[in-house]
């Protein structure tokens, strides 16, 4: 697959997985967590941020800051998931992959989002390096080495 097709594919796939994670959090908010102090609003905030960033990712080629924000929202969701199963978050704890199947689906979409964003960033970096003109040493210096 050439780079001209890869970048739009990565952009669309990243936006899709980010939006899917947001949808799962919105669904959990409506079904279960809206009455949980602090946690409920955080689920709603995560869902809103995911939807907004997913939409912005689809509008042209986003700058690095936007991709970093998408990664940050995703990392925040994963950190909250891990913390809620270990030390707890604001007194809230859960165990295992409950609620099922949303916990597992959320883990998969968020891990997929991070993977896609990482591949996208590596591809953009390689493309920028390839576009630079190589620095050549003057002929005099090459002859003496």
Residue ranges, per PLM feature:
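Membrane-interface extramembranous regions
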Residues: 1-145
């Amino acid at each position: 697959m050439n780079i001209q097709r890869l970048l739009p594919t990565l952009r669309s796939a990243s936006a899709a997985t980010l939006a899917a994670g947001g949808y799962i959090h919105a669904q959990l908010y409506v079904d279960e967590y809206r009455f949980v102090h602090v946690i409920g609003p955080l689920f709603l905030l995560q869902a809103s941020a995911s939807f907004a960033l997913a939409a912005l990712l689809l509008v042209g080629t986003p700058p690095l800051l936007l991709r970093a924000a998408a990664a940050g929202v995703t990392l925040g969701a994963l950190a909250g998931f891990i913390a809620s199963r270990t030390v707890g978050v604001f007194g809230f704890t859960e165990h295992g992959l409950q609620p099922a199947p949303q916990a597992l689906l959320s883990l998969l979409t968020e891990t997929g989002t991070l993977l896609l964003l990482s591949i996208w960033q590596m591809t953009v970096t390689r493309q920028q390096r390839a576009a630079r003109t190589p620095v050549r040493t003057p002929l005099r210096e090459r002859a003496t080495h």
